[in-house]
């Protein structure tokens, strides 16, 4: 694999394009992409965002704290659709995310928030995430 966080942006871009073209040829309904990026370090997250361009339908920011949400918005000029991560691990943190940024925050590792996350995905992606009988993941999860 390519250590995309440590190569120059042009090299990263040259590596990403054939991968995205191959994925496009497969005509997937959705593509979930994870990009580790810091606005303060050259991790090539911005390159990936540029390459995906108008194909981005939903952006979920996993932020370390509520103030990082504002910092990422300012540094990348990107307004995420949802905030998760340590910035949402308490109700006070979720409230602060919403107060500072106006964005919804959901603690996706809290089983009680599973329904809220499902509703968010259904609304944002325009699909139904209802369980299909007998379609449980391995291990019953």
Place the predicted regions along the sequence by residue.
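P-loop NTPase switch/communication element
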Residues: 1-8
